[in-house]
Amino acid sequence: MKAQELRNKSVEELNGELVNLLGEQFKLRMQAATGQLQQTHQLKQVRRSIAQVKTVLTEKAGE
C-alpha cells in the first residue's frame, strides 16, 4: 500500500491494518521456521508495510 493511501486512513483503520500485518508476519515467520515458506520475499514486504503503518501513526500522533 502506498504511503499516501495510508495517510488518508483514520487512526483506527491504521491500528486495524497494523494488527492484521503483525498476524500475517507471525504466520510467515512460523512457515519460514518450519521450511514451508517458498516465497521468502513476503517477509520483507510485510516488515516494510508494518514500518510504513507505524510511521504514519507517529506522524498522526504529532499533529
Swiss-Prot record:
Keyword Magnesium: no
Disulfide bonds listed in the record: none
One GO CC term, this protein: cytosolic large ribosomal subunit
Keywords: Ribonucleoprotein, Ribosomal protein
Single GO molecular function: structural constituent of ribosome
An individual GO BP term: translation
Pfam family, one: Ribosomal_L29
Recorded family membership: Belongs to the universal ribosomal protein uL29 family.
NCBIfam families (UniProt xref): L29 (TIGR00012)
Protein name, UniProt field: Large ribosomal subunit protein uL29
Organism: Glaesserella parasuis serovar 5 (strain SH0165) (Haemophilus parasuis)
Gene of this entry: rpmC
